[in-house]
Regions:
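N-terminal targeting signals for Sec/Tat export/insertion, comprising classic cleavable signal peptides
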Residues: 23-61, 65
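OB-fold (S1/OB) nucleic-acid-binding surfaces
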Residues: 103-120
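Short nucleic-acid-contacting surface segments enriched for D/E, G, S/T with interspersed K/R
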Residues: 124-139
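Structural detector for short beta-strands of small beta-barrel domains
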Residues: 90-104, 140
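Sec/Tat signal peptide C-region and signal peptidase I cleavage site
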Residues: 15-19
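OB-fold/S1-family single-stranded nucleic acid-binding modules
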Residues: 145-163
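Bacterial N-terminal signal peptides
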Residues: 6-14
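Short amphipathic alpha-helices in soluble, non-transmembrane regions
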Residues: 40-41, 75-84
Length: 163
């Protein structure tokens, strides 16, 4: 019986982990020396699910690529910046999630996290109504949020249903 229950739970794991951040490009303000860049690199690598971190000291851009099935949250990335004494600016992200809400007020829920974003198009409108209840990959920008907060609106450039 225990083996059957364990096997059933293991079979459900891939379903629970079907959505996550794939890449986060975060602009960090105030990072102006090699030790600063190293501190950000180490902090980001300490977040479970992070595969690679590239820090460009000249532009302040931190590029984070994540493993499939991760449960990292945007709050963790922001906290990694803030705990090192820096400020985060807009973040460009690629994320998988489920579209909920209504056609006039769609929401992206990032499964495995508490992250939820109101979806706002930046270019030509996409028929979001047909995506309600479906898993999608979204590319877009999270605007800068106050310290300790995460933006609540994702200005998306692309949104594609995951097959």
């Amino acid at each position: 019986m225990k083996k059957t229950v364990a096997a059933a739970l293991l079979a459900l794991l891939p379903l629970a982990a079907h959505a996550e951040y794939e890449q986060v490009n975060l602009t960090v303000f105030g990072m102006d020396c090699a030790p600063c860049a190293h501190a950000i690199h180490v902090s980001m690598k300490g977040i479970q699910g992070v595969n690679t971190v590239d820090v460009d000291l000249n532009t302040g851009l931190v590029t984070i690529k994540l493993a499939p099935g991760n449960s990292a949250s945007m709050r963790q990335f922001n906290q990694a910046v803030e705990k090192n004494g820096f400020t985060h600016k807009d973040a460009e992200i690629v994320v998988k999630g489920k579209v909920t809400g209504t056609a006039s007020a769609p929401v992206l829920e990032v499964t495995g996290t508490e992250d939820r974003y109101a979806l706002s198009p930046t270019a030509a409108n996409v028929d979001v109504a047909s995506l309600i209840g479906k898993t999608v990959t979204v590319g877009g920008v999270l605007p800068q949020a106050p310290k300790g907060k995460v933006a609540d609106t994702l200005r998306y450039k692309t949104i594609v249903e995951v097959q």
